[in-house]
A protein has these predicted regions:
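Short amphipathic alpha-helical heptad-repeat segments
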Residues: 1-13, 25-31
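Short, flexible coil/linker elements and helix-boundary hinge sites characteristic
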Residues: 19-20, 30, 40, 64, ...
Length: 83
């Protein structure tokens, strides 16, 4: 399941980074938040960290953009997740 979520998260973040003004941005952001809640419910805060670490590096390599600001979209899911 995590592999599918990772690919979906990767695609969503790439889309949001490259298209910040599109009409469906809020829908995409909402799905990113939902993925975070699913990961946390399944595997805890470590899963959030591991997933985002992997995604950040992939995005940096592929499009040269920093995904770290998008970590804040998962704030409020876990008390230990504060970005």
């Amino acid at each position: 399941m995590d592999a599918y979520l990772e690919e979906e998260l990767y695609d969503l973040l790439i889309y949001c980074i490259q298209n910040p003004q599109v009409p469906d941005f809020a829908v995409k952001k909402g799905r990113v938040e939902e993925i975070g809640r699913e990961l946390y419910a399944d595997s805890g805060a470590d899963a959030l960290e591991n997933m985002f670490f992997s995604i950040e590096h992939r995005i940096k390599e592929v499009i040269g953009s920093d995904a770290k600001p998008y970590r804040a979209w998962w704030n409020g899911i876990a008390s230990e997740w504060k970005y």
